[in-house]
Amino acid sequence: MISKGKTKGSVRFALTPARGGKKVELAGEFNDWMPSTMRKQKDGSFVSIVELSPGTYEYKFIVDGQWIVDPDNGARALSAVGTINSVAQVG
């Protein structure tokens, strides 16, 4: 799930893994597809706040090493290498 963060330009990415994942990471065009660890919350969800300029960004979550699209965001794109990615529209 993506939503506006508390500060201007911040985007909140959140995921509650279906199988209670132990490690969740976020990777996308905004961090050169280098996975960054998301913070686990008391409710079992994982959250990451990213500062982004207006634009369109492709991204995925990595749950215990498995790359997945955002199950709460139906916006998708086919990448240049033939994989399906989630899409975040900012601004």
Feature annotation, model-predicted:
Residues 4-54, 66-91:
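Aromatic-rich carbohydrate-binding modules that target alpha-glucans
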Residues 57-59:
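A short tyrosine-centered beta-strand micro-motif
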